[in-house]
Regions:
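Right-handed parallel beta-helix
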Residues: 110-184, 364-494
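C-terminal outer-membrane/trafficking sorting elements
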Residues: 695-706, 710-789
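Right-handed parallel beta-helix/beta-spiral solenoid domain characteristic of secreted/periplasmic
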Residues: 35, 72-126, 157, 320, ...
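Predominantly extracellular beta-rich ligand-binding scaffolds that present long acidic/polar faces
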Residues: 64-74, 136-139, 147, 160, ...
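Surface beta-loop-beta hairpin patches that serve as ligand-binding interfaces in beta-rich domains
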Residues: 247-263, 305, 638-688
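Right-handed parallel beta-helix/beta-solenoid
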Residues: 23-44, 48, 59-61, 251-295, ...
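Extracellular/surface-exposed low-complexity segments
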Residues: 22, 26, 207-210, 215-276, ...
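N-terminal extracellular ligand-recognition/capping segment immediately after the signal peptide
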Residues: 36, 43, 51-74, 78-81, ...
Length: 789
């Protein structure tokens, strides 16, 4: 019995040693598509592998989407065992545009991928598809650990981070080529998030180039935890990367670059694009245009001294008609300008992509004379972390917005944003609190002569279907029309159907809301048509607005210091003005020379907690609108609102024109005294800029300038058909003469003169819109110019 026991113990010991030895010695699992290996698919080999094993794929194209499944293994081609780089191109993982080609998402800590071509992947995750080529996704503090060696990662797509996505991972990149991947939004090549640490091999260097996305085309970081990042590669797209190529969307990371080669020399020249152009063209002239807007943006230089412009020829730009890549981005100090918004159209084909998306580092740019239409996305034009951006003469229409954003949005911490002659109409917001436009965290904002019409927004709690601005600087809304915008809140009480101006991080500057028209806006399960807030040390100037037939419990809700002058307020609801109780601020309302339905009783002062100064000149009468034509809310003859506004407009900072660009202060009742009217229209006044313009004869007078926009100088060209006196003046947007460039008698012909951006006293003028006015005895005509600074 004792001998049998000893033998039994011996066999048990041997069995244990054999098992332990099998665990300690890595197995090599072969993958051959001809069936002569252990398996025919890489995933089958991974499923059979244990920690430390090698899954070795022989040449072939593997149409699969592999997952390391939490195993610390090496998955490699024969390049791993032979050192022969030819096996990289011969051993392909093709994701078939179904998901990420390779996923490491299950707590792998020491995995290796080596020697493959990774292509045709389409990201993983739910809505925001990430990592078309390789998706590395950890759960901090449990980080994914892996090495990616000698792989070619190309031809992959995703919403973000198309080539490689690293989220909470420690990743070593060695000898990889990451090129020609495309992300709809950012990170065409590599995207890095969270607490990740990505290290580039300084000996066996990677190359990252010619990837595409709307912004951060090669490398994007989206992390507040990565304060420094070193890019060490053999080849990059450009020699001196700017934020269009590399940036951190969430933090001002200190980037350093060690680049040995580059493939693109940015073109320091205006570029021309046409729907029937060709991207092999230089793009240097209208006669040799490029085709894709995205390609022109990628190619053009960002020049802080001499801003450049991408000129779009008339036509429709879309994926279906001329293979446009949407969305496209833009660089700092680059303008995108069409011929005019009627004939230069960017069409989204009702796809799920936006149209124009930018991020940190996008500044000093103008988008003008374009129409954006027919897109279905989380947002149409998205400009995050942007500063000194102008939108002039653009239309956004016939779009569907999903998932919380807007048709035009500066989503995070924007700087100074300006709208002029912007139309946003027929936008349907599905599960989004604001349909048309949302400016979030702007330093300064202005909207002038804009139209927000027929926009609808529905969500659990809506903000505004028209314009929503939460800013920490001064805000101006001037000469705008808000017509038939509708909000529907399905849960909590919503805010304002048409206009919402509020603070950002407990600060806001002065608000100037004047000469606007609000008609037919509807707030379902919400509060008001207009909401505006000031801080105790700032104020709201609410002057010369017309609010008619808007449906909401309150026409306007105010908080702070409000100066309410010269308005017409006659709406469908309980009160025209609401001042709610706030334990942290007492509101003060100064109200004079308004026509308010219900008079002083139409002001709701909750708990009597706020202070209302009901001053002189307020009335409650039928305004007597003309109710016909394109502007039916002009005052009719005999209206008691004519010449009934504030006698002295000093300190109101009103422009000299009304909604129709007629004189703002005019003697409408013919008593010999010019006085401002109530509302946004001045009765029977003459045009402001050209009040004494002669009748235009049928002769050929022409005026233009180039470049336009310009900095610091431009050449103004003009043609006169007959001999006579000629004057060429420059006016600013306020109608003030800046300079006289020509004052002489001229023979018929074409002439040009240079303007250096200085006024009559040789002082540099500020950036903005200017008009070159050509004056002859026969005709006065003008041309708009844009000075970019």
């Amino acid at each position: 019995m004792k001998q049998n026991s000893t033998i039994k113990k011996f066999f048990i010991t041997v069995f244990v040693l054999i098992c332990v030895n099998s665990w300690l010695i890595a197995s090599t699992i072969t993958i051959k598509q001809d069936g002569t290996g252990d398996f025919t698919t890489i995933q089958a080999g991974i499923n059979a592998a244990s920690h430390g094993d090698i899954v070795l794929a022989y040449p072939g194209t593997y149409y699969e989407n592999i997952d390391f499944s939490g195993k610390n293994i090496t998955v490699a081609s024969l390049e791993y065992t032979t050192g022969d780089p030819q096996y990289i191109a011969q051993t392909v993982i093709d994701g078939q545009r179904q998901a990420s080609c390779v996923s490491l998402i299950s707590a792998e800590t020491d995995a290796v991928l080596e020697g493959f071509t990774i292509t045709n992947g389409q990201g993983g995750g739910q809505y925001w598809l990430l990592g078309g080529g390789i998706n590395i996704f950890g759960d901090y503090p449990e980080m994914i650990g892996c090495s990616i060696i000698n792989c070619v990662i190309t031809g992959n797509v995703a919403y973000n981070s198309a080539g490689i996505c690293v989220d909470e991972g420690n990743v070593f990149l060695s000898g990889c080529s990451i090129t020609n991947n495309y992300a709809y939004y950012n990170g065409g090549g590599i995207g890095i998030k969270g607490h990740s640490n990505v290290v580039f091999d300084t000996i066996n260097r990677c190359s990252v180039y010619n990837n595409r996305s709307s912004y951060s085309v090669d490398i994007v970081l989206a992390s507040p935890f990565i304060h420094e990042f070193e890019v060490v590669v053999d080849t990059f797209t450009v020699a001196q990367p700017n934020p269009y190529f590399v940036t951190n969307n969430a933090y001002n990371t200190d980037f350093s670059f060690d680049l040995q080669n580059y493939v693109l020399e940015p073109v320091d020249h205006d570029l021309y694009v046409s729907p029937d152009g060709d991207d092999i063209n230089s793009g240097f002239s209208p006669d040799e245009p490029m085709k894709r807007i995205n390609t022109a943006v990628h190619k053009i230089a960002s020049n802080t001294e001499t801003p450049r412009t991408i000129h779009l020829a008339p036509g429709i730009y879309s994926k279906s008609m001329n293979d446009q890549i949407l969305p496209f981005g833009c660089k700092a100090y680059v303008n995108i300008i069409g011929e005019n918004q009627e004939n230069t159209i960017i069409d989204g084909d009702i796809s799920e992509d936006g149209i124009l998306i930018t991020s940190r580092g996008y500044e000093h740019s103008t988008i003008s004379d374009l129409t954006f239409q027919n897109f279905q996305s989380i947002g149409g034009i998205i400009t995050n972390y942007s500063d000194m951006i102008r939108y002039d003469n653009i239309t956004i229409k016939n779009c569907i917005i999903t998932d919380m954003l807007s048709a035009l949005i500066s989503a995070t911490s924007g700087g100074n944003i300006a709208f002029e002659n912007v139309t946003i109409e027929n936008i349907e917001g599905l599960d989004t609190p604001n349909a048309a436009a949302w400016m979030n965290g702007t330093t300064g904002f202005s909207a002038k002569n804009c139209l927000f019409r027929n926009n609808t927004s529905s969500s659990s709690m809506t903000t505004s279907a028209g314009l929503y601005v939460n800013g920490n600087g001064d805000m101006t809304v001037e000469g705008c029309r808000f017509i038939n915008n509708t909000t529907t809140s399905t849960n909590a009480i919503g805010w304002a159907s048409a206009l919402l101006l509020t603070d950002y991080n407990q600060f806001i500057g002065d608000s100037y809301i004047h000469d606007n028209l609000f008609v037919g806006n509807v707030n379902n399960n919400g509060k008001s048509t207009v909401y505006a807030k000031s801080m105790p040390y700032t104020k709201i100037n609410f002057f010369n607005n017309t609010l008619i037939d808007n449906v909401s419990p309150y026409g306007c809700e105010f908080e702070g210091n409000i100066y309410c002058r010269n308005n017409i307020m006659r709406n469908i609801g309980d009160y025209e003005i609401a001042l709610f109780y706030d334990p942290e601020i007492t509101s003060y309302l100064w109200c004079s020379h308004n026509n308010i339905l219900g008079g002083e009783d139409a002001i709701f002062n909750q708990f009597g907690a706020n202070v209302v100064y009901w001053e002189e000149g307020n009335i409650d009468v039928d305004p007597q609108f003309v109710l016909v034509g394109d502007d039916p809310y002009q005052l009719a003859a005999g209206s008691l609102c004519i010449d009934a506004g504030t006698p002295d407009t000093t300190g109101m900072f009103l422009p000299p024109w009304d909604m129709l660009e007629n004189h703002r202060v005019w003697d409408g009742d013919g008593n010999g005294e010019a006085r401002i009217d109530m509302g946004c229209y001045e009765f029977d006044s003459e045009p402001w800029a050209y009040a004494h313009q002669p009748v235009v004869p049928a002769v050929d007078y022409q005026i233009s300038n180039y470049p336009n926009p310009f900095n610091p100088s431009t050449t103004i060209c003009f043609t006169v058909p007959q001999q006579g006196a000629v004057k060429l003046h420059v006016y600013n947007i306020r109608g003030q003469k800046v300079a006289t460039l020509v004052d002489c008698v001229s023979a018929p012909g074409s002439y040009n003169v240079q303007w250096d951006g200085r006024d009559a006293d040789n002082r540099p003028v500020g950036g903005g819109v200017y008009f070159a006015q050509l004056v002859t005895p026969q005709r006065t005509t003008a041309h708009k110019m844009i000075l970019i600074k």
